[in-house]
Amino acid sequence: MDKRLNAICGDAIEELSKLENGIVDLIVTDPPYNLNKNYGTSQDKLEFEEYLEFSRTWLNEAKRVLKPDGTIYVFMGMKYISYIYTILEQELGMTFNSWITWFYTQGIGKTKGFSPRHDDILMFTKNPKKFFFDLDSIRVPQKYYRSVNNMRGANPGNVWEFSHMHYCNKNRKKHPTQKPDRKSTRLN
């Protein structure tokens, strides 16, 4: 198996348009959540329909470059996750596989309402039966010892508890929405 990893950083629509059809095995993407955050280069606030059209455009390009057995993981906050799901399944005809909840202990402080403590990750594939998923590489220790069944470890499930990459963490880079490495290794 070819284990090359090519990370492409840049404007998704622009960079994806440079790629040929059907050449990418895996896409892991963390698009803007459209929450009016300033990330230094642009404001993250589009009108509702404009944001959905932006999402349709880059998701269509992502599907185009995926191999027939390719997989896409999309990180998204709660405000637009259902719309992204609908675009992928209903408009682009991709196959839903998993809805992962990333639970973290440090949330955004709020005085009116509950503090957000999770983000969502959607897993979609182009083919419902033929796609790569290496469960053995991401197993977690069994909670209870059993001498039967799968002692190699358990499926980690779809609720993942990982802390944010805190701003004072020595491994923190300059990316404004950096994800913890341990979480990213589960996306295969």
Provide a role label for each language-model segment:
Residues 1-186:
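Core catalytic lobe of class I
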